Amino acid sequence: DVYKRQDQTCRDMELVIKDTAYAGFITKEELKGILQHKGIYPIGKKMERISTKSLERELSKHPLIDEAECYKTPSGKVCVEVTQRIPILRVMSSNGQNYYLDNKGTVMPPDAKCVAHRVIVTGNVEKSFAMKDLYKFGVFLHNNKFWDAQIEQIHVLPDQNIELVPRVGDHLVYLGKLENFEDKLARLKEFYKKGLNRVGWNKYSRINLEFNNQIICTKRE
């Protein structure tokens, strides 16, 4: 037996919640509450009777937890590490649906406490389109420092064409279909650096990236 005494009791539980910079949904108190409610809170229990698998199983049922890992130490401590699901997009569809999408394209409840600002998605957002295609675009924005800071809103038109509302500059960006979005945004970034920095960020009302190898700008009236 790895424990000092056969009848050693658990004297401490260490809880680690990962990804708190992006997701502030789950508190340590909440995790304790789940385990207490199920009667498997480890402190005070005999170490040999504590099932780390049961702890992992119960915590993983939580809708905001991606995975849970539990292990015991020889000194009588139980360690619990929880990975949260990361919200990428906040969907507020014109059909009344309201939810977060996580980094794996799974729907999260709208009442989740999100600590970081998330890109808002509006317009004709079908859930199937959001879970299959839109979330990948959201992950790209989230993982790219420049675009994460620059894009404030994604608007989905009835034909699933996409408009982007940037934080800086008073213009709309028309992306068209999501296909080749990386190439389209690379062109836009280049245009921002070379074009808009020279003529000013408010010269154009609309920037169209729909067609390959060109950018069509509409001047402000």
Regions found by a protein language model. Give the residues of each.
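Short, small-residue-biased leader/transition segments that mark boundaries at the very start
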Residues: 2-3
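Extracytoplasmic/luminal low-complexity segments enriched in Pro/Gly and acidic/polar residues
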Residues: 175-221
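Membrane-embedded segments
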Residues: 53-88, 103-106
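Periplasmic/extracytosolic POTRA-like scaffold domains at the N-termini of outer-membrane
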Residues: 19-61, 112-138, 176, 186, ...
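Extracytoplasmic
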Residues: 10-12, 50, 63, 73-77, ...
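Extracytoplasmic segments of membrane-associated envelope/inner-membrane machinery
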Residues: 81-158
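Short beta-strands and strand-coil junctions in structured, solvent-facing domains, enriched
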Residues: 66-67, 77, 86-90, 108-109, ...
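Flexible glycine-/small-residue-rich
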Residues: 15-19, 82-86, 112, 123, ...
